[in-house]
C-alpha cells in the first residue's frame, strides 16, 4: 500500500488526496489485488475487504458513485451510492471518490480549503461537460480553484474515431491540437489531459496540475479497461481534514 500516489499540487494543508494503485488488496487475478470496483465480477467479499483497507488507512469515509459517463454532480454522501459522475463536499472526513481504469479522474479544491470535488471524465462525459458542471457545483469563481488530473490513458495509447475529435472541436476549435492522426485511416490519437485543460481553461480554471500518466502502459500500478476488458478499478479520492 506504500505504492499509492499522493497528488503533487499546491492544495491547502487541510485538503487531503490519494490515488490507489493495484497494490495492497486481496483480489485474485485478473483483479489483483486492490480492486475497488463492485461492478466488475470480482468476488464481493474481496471488494469489501479492499474497501475496508482503504477506509482504515485513509481515516475518511469514501462516497462511492454509480458512474454512468454523464454530467450529474451530487453532494458526497458515504451512506449511499448515488448515480452520478462527480461529487463535492464541504464536510470534513467525507471523501469524494472516483473509480477509473483509463478514464480521467479530476480532483478539485478551492484555494481557501473549504470545498473539494472529484469528477469521472471519460471522453463522453468530458465532451458533455462534466468538468464544467463540477466547477459550477463548487460555487466559487474558476480562478479560486485548483485541479489535479489523475492517472488516465495516455496520448500514445488512446486511439479514437473521427466522431470523438469532431465532438470536441465543435465546442472548442483549440481541441484540434489534442488529436494526432494515427496509423489507421480515419483514426486519431487523443490527449485526454490536454482536452481537460482546454475545457477547464475555457471555464475560467487555469490552475491545473497533474497529468503525464498512462494507465494503459503502466501495467504494474494501474488497471486499464482498454488493455484488458476484464479488470479492476482504482480510486482517486479528495477530502477535507478536520
Swiss-Prot record:
Purine nucleoside enzyme that catalyzes the phosphorolysis of adenosine and inosine nucleosides, yielding D-ribose 1-phosphate and the respective free bases, adenine and hypoxanthine. Also catalyzes the phosphorolysis of S-methyl-5'-thioadenosine into adenine and S-methyl-5-thio-alpha-D-ribose 1-phosphate. Also has adenosine deaminase activity. It holds the Pfam family Cu-oxidase_4. This is Purine nucleoside phosphorylase PA4543. Zn(2+) binds at residues 69, 103, 120. One of its GO terms (molecular function) is adenosine deaminase activity. Keywords: Copper, Hydrolase, Metal-binding, Oxidoreductase, Transferase, Zinc. Belongs to the purine nucleoside phosphorylase YfiH/LACC1 family. Its cofactor is Cu(2+); Zn(2+). Transmembrane segments: none annotated. Its EC number is 2.4.2.1, 3.5.4.4, 2.4.2.28. It comes from the Bacteria. Homodimer. It catalyses: adenosine + phosphate = alpha-D-ribose 1-phosphate + adenine; S-methyl-5'-thioadenosine + phosphate = 5-(methylsulfanyl)-alpha-D-ribose 1-phosphate + adenine; inosine + phosphate = alpha-D-ribose 1-phosphate + hypoxanthine; adenosine + H2O + H(+) = inosine + NH4(+).
